[in-house]
Amino acid sequence: MRPPGIMSGVPYRPWSFETKVHEGAEATVSKGEWLGKPAMLKLRKPKGYRNPDLDNRLTKSRMAVEARALSRLQKRNFPSPSLFYVDHQDSLIIISEIEGLPLFEVMANGNLGEDALSRVGGIIRRLHENGVSHGDLTTHNIMIDPSGEIFLIDFGLAKISPELENLGQDLQVLNECLTASHSEYPGAIEKVVSGYISFSTSVPDVPDSGDVTLRFDEIRNRVRYLG
């Protein structure tokens, strides 16, 4: 059952609406409070071009995976939003707000710390060692808080127990973003990969960092060839 105040936009317990922060093709994101805590509400949009039953099943499946990923990471103290509430019927999810700036803005403003990209690589490896791939790892979905801690956000395309290809693809998505949007930082992806390898530990059933970076190189070369 939906808690009162979720969809109304009227301040009310447990969700108190403040402002809309993003209107995208996939979802509408609003800022507010959940039981007095700073929170973000993501409401997934139906796809008009899709069969309604199929769209509903796909949306529920994606939301279930996103919720599972966030819950898993939360239990393991991974730097990502905390999961507050999920409503599969209304296609919405409420998570904690991460204060700070997207890596995109930090890099655009020229305020990137010397070891930041290496630490980003370490966070990505830590994500993978927790059995999760991100699926949309751009500099908009990497946050740096006021203390300099790095967080990953927006797990709408995440996978649980991902295959090697998914892990390599995470690095490739970030590589494409760095190349297209941050060309003023040459060699950025190499710093990320260095941090990815440096953080690596041996985890059962998780491909080691060498295999992942090798697959990333294969994907990158494949894209260059096709391009």
Predicted regions and their residues:
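Conserved structural core of kinase catalytic domains
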Residues: 59-63, 74, 78-120
